Amino acid sequence: MTELIKVDEKRYAEPIILDNNIILPGQEETVRLSAGRLPSDNRLYIYAHVYRSVNPGPTVLMMGGVHGDEINGVMVARNMIEEKVFEKLNRGTVISVPLLNVFGFINFSREVPDGKDINRSFPGTMAGSLLQE
């Protein structure tokens, strides 16, 4: 039996705030988020593509590249964005992050430089290691 997800309509009307970017219902936005620094001191970024319907509904987070050596999810997420799959969203919100583990992707590795697996480190902490931030 399928259960319907109840959505608080008042809460849905509130903006989603990602790194000082405000996304309201009915908007779509690509947000650049800091993902750390290289030894050269150059910053690395990840991109979150946020699509919000005007109609309340569930929020789906789609992340590719959690493990840098598994690239299928990266391509699926990118193709869905390029094909504009989410632009006609009837209800709810989709947040798509095509490549989460930039360090692992560059090095074709599951781990980040401190040897940890992102998939074993949720929810993280701002005072933690590179991975936990």
Per-segment meaning from a language model:
Residues 1-133:
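Structured catalytic-domain cores with a bias toward divalent-metal coordination
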